[in-house]
Design a protein with these regions (language model features):
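An extracytoplasmic/periplasmic, membrane-proximal ligand-sensing/linker region
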Residues: 27, 31, 35, 41-43, ...
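N-terminal signal peptide c-region/cleavage motif recognized by signal peptidases
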Residues: 17-19
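Sec-dependent signal peptide recognition
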Residues: 2-10
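Short beta-strand->loop
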Residues: 123-133, 169, 191-195, 213-214, ...
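N-terminal (or domain-start) structured segment
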Residues: 23-126, 165, 173, 177, ...
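Beta->alpha turn/N-cap motifs
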Residues: 104-109, 200, 216-222, 238-241, ...
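Hinge/capping helix and adjacent helix->loop/strand transition within the periplasmic-binding protein
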Residues: 94-100, 107, 115-202, 253-255, ...
Length: 338
């Protein structure tokens, strides 16, 4: 994460009203300082805006366990999937801004949907505000064994000599697995045909079955089948600037010649707009403590993630930068929602 850029400067650059960039409004009228200090005073609801089984589930449970241990309040993880995270994110946006309903956020609902959809039930920065990044994970360029390539160089040569004949899969139009592939193809000067699926599990089944040629898969969900099926798929590269300790023998696209290529899946904590600033601060501080020691960092690493806490302002900067990147790709490729 780059050094902190003051939020006021970011707002000025983006020509946005200050209230849109605020990380949490002042406590609402009638809410006493004592109430804020007593937070949390009832069980927490941590919403995952995807169906059960996504990479976000262990993040939600790990953070919830820490909050319960620290604050003595129980929590429930509620999966509200659908529309690439829109439904669950919209639910949190409309929830009471008291810090008791929280969102585990990720690129789809936060940096992609606002650039792809025209009628979102929320505005990022106004209805949904960042609290802290929690973890990041690179994506893995996974090729089917049907592709005659044992490494990235051979893979790139295959695509170059067979323009428009290779097929890449995604978990859906506009999904981060789609946009990462488009960014790769643009930067590498290659071409391939997009084959969108309705969810990652279908992609993985067809990738293992040899029905598609390659897929950019977040490491947490890719690492198991890569290791279990070396005869069916090959991990050719990772999308982070540095190699992953989970796949130490797999090079980065950056070191393979795509200088500066850096695309990561990430997992963060967000809250409803209007959440009192003292509550945002308390949540951020406890998230930072959770990621600095204890059980949570080890649990996240066990899923292929790298723990990374930020201030709300740093997380906001990260969101803005990534949103601009995806906006450019969506416009250039004329990507439309299904």
């Amino acid at each position: 994460m780059k050094p902190l850029v003051r939020l006021a400067t970011l707002c000025a650059i983006a020509a946005l009203p200050v209230h849109v960039c605020a990380q949490g409004a002042a406590p609402a009228a009638g809410q006493s300082a004592a109430q804020t200090q007593a937070y949390p005073n009832k069980p927490l609801k941590i919403v995952v805006p995807f169906f059960a089984g996504s990479d976000l589930d262990p993040v939600a449970r790990g953070l919830g366990d820490h909050f319960t241990t620290t604050w003595g309040q129980h929590y429930v993880v509620e999966n509200k999937g659908g529309a690439n995270g829109q439904i669950g994110t919209g639910y949190v946006a409309k929830s009471a801004p008291d810090g008791h309903t929280l969102l585990i956020c990720s690129p789809g609902p936060i940096t992609i949907n606002p650039n792809l959809q025209t009628n979102l039930p929320y505005t990022v920065g106004k209805d949904i505000v960042p609290v802290s990044l929690i973890a990041t994970a690179p994506m893995v360029l996974v090729a089917s064994a049907r592709v005659p390539a044992r490494n990235y160089a051979e893979f790139a040569t295959y695509l170059k000599t067979n323009p428009g004949k290779a097929f890449f899969a995604s978990a859906g139009v506009g999904n981060v697995t789609h946009l990462a592939a488009e960014l790769f193809l643009r930067q590498a000067g290659l071409s391939a045909v997009h084959t969108p699926y309705k969810g990652a599990q279908s992609v993985i089944a067809d990738l293992l079955g040899g029905h598609v040629d390659f897929y950019f898969n977040p490491l947490p969900s890719a690492r198991t089948y890569i290791k279990d099926h070396p005869d069916k798929v090959r991990a050719l590269a990772v999308t982070s600037l540095e190699r992953s300790p989970h796949l130490p023998d797999v090079p980065t696209l950056n070191e393979l010649g795509l200088k500066g290529f850096d695309v990561n899946s990430w997992y963060g904590l967000c809250a409803p707009g209007g959440t009192p600033q003292p509550v945002i601060t308390k949540l951020n501080g406890e998230t930072t403590r959770a990621l600095s020691g204890g059980e949570l960092p080890g649990r996240l690493r066990g899923f292929g993630m790298s723990p990374q806490a930020t201030t709300p302002e740093q997380f906001d900067e990260h969101i803005r930068k990534e949103s601009a990147q995806w906006a450019a790709i969506i416009k250039e490729k004329n990507i439309k929602p299904e």
